[in-house]
């Protein structure tokens, strides 16, 4: 259950819907079907982050597969910064060719698995 102020903040930060009324993922620029919507904290909650953006589930999982919470807090506090990450750019080019409701299991990057 959310309070009135949190609902207003969330509504103000929601991505602009397209003609079909679906929000648009700020990473891949595709409409997000209701069952594929995930809230992503730009700065992880464990690091004091409050602001969220609505992402495709597959995009959200890819962000966390590639980056640690420390990296998200330090270097990737904005969507534009996430889009500029080299591995994320490669992923976004690939996922843009998929249907809006496409989902595939995401694995941690080898760099993160080695930690």
Where in this protein do the model-derived segments appear?
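Short, charged surface segments at domain edges that flank catalytic/cofactor-binding sites
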Residues: 1-24
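A general structural-boundary detector
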Residues: 12-15, 43-46, 78
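Histidine-centered nuclease catalytic patch
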Residues: 19-54
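A mid-sequence interfacial segment
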Residues: 98-115
